[in-house]
Structure formats: C-alpha cells, structure tokens
Amino acid sequence: IENLPNKEWWKLDANLTGGELFHLIHELDLLCWLLGDIEAVFAQAANQAHHDTPDSRDVLQLLLRFKNGVLGSLEMGTAYRLHQWGIQIHGENGVIEVNFFTSSVTFNYLDGKIEHVDLFDEFEADLSLRESAKGTQQYNVTHAPCQLWLSRAAEIEVQSVVEHLTQGKISPLSLCLTEAIEVAEAAKQSMVTEKQISVKK
C-alpha cells in the first residue's frame, strides 16, 4: 500500500474518472463476457488505506446477479497486503481458475483431471505478466516502458478489431460493448443508496 506522490493527477479525481471501479473495469468486463448479462448489483466501498486521497475508494465489493441465474461476486481495490488477481468460476462439471499472477488458466474437472494453459501463446509475454504482477503497478510515470504482456494484449485487441472490420469475423470485443460500464454505474448508485440496483439496458 503506497501513497501516491502526485495527488493532483487527474486519474485520482473520481468526478472525472468514476473512481477505482472504473479504473479496474476490465475484470468486470471479462465477467460479463464469460457469464452473460448482469441484471442486478449490490455494492459497497470504503477508503481503508489511502487517507491522503479522501475521495479514493480503495476497497470495493460487488454482489452480482446474472440474467441466467448465476450469482457472482467481485472484490477489487488497492488496500490489500496479500494481493490476489484472478477469477474463479464454479460450474456443474468443475472449476475454472484464471490466475493473472501465474499467467495461467486451470481447469479442475469433477473426475480429478486437471489441465493448465497459459494466457498467452508467447512465453515471453506470460513471463512479463508474472514479473509485472509481483510489484505495484506504476501509473503516471513519465517515459516508463510499456510491459510486454500489455503490449501483446493491445496487439491482440487491435488484430481482433481489424479482422472484424475487414473480414466480418465476430470479435469478442463487439459482444459486450457497454455492459461493464452500465453495471459499474449501477454499482456506484448502490454504494450511495445502500440498496440493490437493477442494471439498466
């Protein structure tokens, strides 16, 4: 847990950015893509460690109800001593674990079979993510080099968009365009009202 040296940085202004929930929108976006539309959310948040930036909410918890009946939870923030970064999906036939620290996905089947796959098709990109995940993510650092894993992820996204536009291929990026933002907006409302909020479509 580190206090940020530049408290005037625009990204710390929740009125401009929406706050931590919108900074970490990618995991919520991934849940929408993997599990389907979310119909309701209950959320709570607090500033546990970054008291020098009082508008910051460094711990956020969301309870999610999906339209298909699935229940989910999402916890995120920057005030944790023991960092975790991953996703678990529990289903009828086993458990899928995405671990961003190890850059891997593990499939645990009911019959005891276990399969592991890397997140990237390139060893160097997986290694880059593993190394990057060990430390504090640095932002607003002038001339800081982009991590290889992040560059590769951006390249994959761009290639997907190009193929969608030039070849008509269905892109995962086009399937959930605004869902995560809509859920995040509902979560913000829930934090204020302390009530479950239906997600507007």
List the model feature ranges, each with a label.
Residues R57, L62-G69, I89-G91:
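Active-site beta-strand termini and strand-to-loop segments that position acidic
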Residues I1-T53, E194:
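Predominantly a Rossmann-like dinucleotide-binding segment in NAD(P)-dependent oxidoreductases
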Residues S73-M76, V98-F100:
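Beta-strand scaffold of nucleotide-dependent catalytic cores
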Residues E27-L31, E155-V162, A184:
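A general structural signal for well-ordered alpha-helical segments in protein cores
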Residues I25, E75-H83:
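Glycine-rich phosphate/pyrophosphate-binding beta-alpha loops
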Residues F66, N93-L175:
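C-terminal glycine/acidic-rich active-site capping loop/insertion
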Residues Q189-K201:
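C-terminal capping/lid region of NAD(P)-dependent oxidoreductase domains
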Residues T178-M191:
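C-terminal hydrophobic helical "lid"/dimerization subdomain
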